[in-house]
Amino acid sequence: SCLREGSDIDRIAEVIQNVPGRPLVVVSALWGMTDRLFRAAREPQYAGRLVNDLKSQHLLFAPGLDTGEFSELFKKVISGISNELVNLSSGEYSLRSENLILAAGERLSALAVAHRLRSIGLDANPIGAEDIGLKLKGKGRASEIDISASSEKLEREKLIGIPILTGWFGEGEDGDIAILSRGGSDHSAAAFANLMNASKLILWKDVDGIKRLNPRWGIETPAIDYLGYGQASELALHGTPVIHPATVSPLIEPGIPLEIRNIKNPTTDAPTVIGPDFDLDSIVAIGCQPGVSVITQEGPLNSDLLSR
């Protein structure tokens, strides 16, 4: 997440105020929040301290959230985290309880962003993705969003004003909450772009686009100015940490362009734009997939293994 401090929400406000047309905003949890929620779900003994820390951190981002227009929703989410942590601390693991705890990060983020935007006069409205019919493929944990089912069920009339939507989770095939893999808010944003016939999707990150080499390798390379959908998917699958691997799939059929922008430099041109595949022959980047091993078995040329 690029939501590290309150000033990042101010940058979001600046973007919204200057964007043409009607924006729809999809948020992830505040920076570091999902890791802490994962730990609390797996180690409930940290529950009491975590809940207090969550409340304090979000109030630093959005002062007055606990007394403002969304105060009841804020208290409900905080209380929900406490209740689910109590359930887990009883010793009986529940994927549903864990999912509800994890999804609270996005819910709190949407409330904090909406509250802060409202404080400067923007008509921002926090909305839970599963509350308006976003359907996921899977139960509990899902690989991707079901665009076809979501298109039929999505309650678009609830997207009023400037919607601040939760990323990363939705409604699973069993009607209960389901979450995507880590970084799935990118995919959520792309799905909403598809479902709302958006002219463009912008992913705001804390990096300058997708680089030719993974910056974690310690070699500085320039950003790739243009990537095809297929190229972007391949890089996401092979070690490029900027976007979720499923991000571009909802964008391909409608041909929606995707821009990767740096929230720290909102007025500069997009370092990387993703769109239709044009040039499939040139090498644009190098990626790798860690944790993969090759096993080679050697034997005489007349070995029976060769005929199997």
Question: Which residue ranges define each predicted feature?
Answer:
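Nucleotide/pyrophosphate-binding catalytic subdomain
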Residues: 1-243, 248
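Self-splicing inteins and homing endonuclease
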Residues: 134-142, 265-282
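Binding-interface segments
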Residues: 258
